[in-house]
Amino acid sequence: MIRQVITSYFLTVCLLALVQGETVQDCENKLPTSLKSRLCEIRRYEIIEGPEMDKHIHCVMRALDFVYEDGRGDYHKLYDPLNIIELDKRHDVNLEKCIGECVQVPTSERAHVFYKCLLKSTTGRTFKKVFDLMELKQAGKVPQHQRYTAEFVQIMKDYDKALNC
């Protein structure tokens, strides 16, 4: 019985590792030439338009598990992290609004529309913190259980500096 439980657990962990897929770094490594020179702008959350940017943001938002495969924003993946960093009832409204906006555009543009909508909303500052924290966790720069603190600003600056940004 114990052997079956252990085997089942091991197989589940292996399956999750396979499903997890790409990281933000993987997405940045696949940037097309036209965007490679703009990586630092992208990392500063500057809005860049175009189909190549749509594809990149889709990749990054999927890597962080903030959107579904079809690019729709995942309310449940962002609501708690946003409110842990900053408790604000507007996060709920902004997530709903941005999900509503992204479902009205073609699938290829959804993740980018969701991303831009969140950045432009009153949730934007907190969304950037959640985004940075999740990226740092994914890159192994901070423990998975770690909450956002002021020191993450410097950790992220150091991480960006290592990328020549």
From Swiss-Prot:
Changing E28L: Reduces serotonin and tryptamine binding. Reduces serotonin binding and increases tryptamine binding. Noradrenaline binds at E28, R43, D132, E135. Changing Y115L: Modestly reduces serotonin binding and significantly reduces tryptamine binding. Female saliva (at protein level). Female salivary gland. Not detected in female carcass without salivary glands. Not detected in male tissues. Keywords: Disulfide bond, Secreted, Signal, Vasoactive, Vasodilator. SUPFAM superfamilies: Insect pheromone/odorant-binding proteins. GO terms for molecular function: odorant binding. This is Short form salivary protein D7R4. The gene is D7r4.
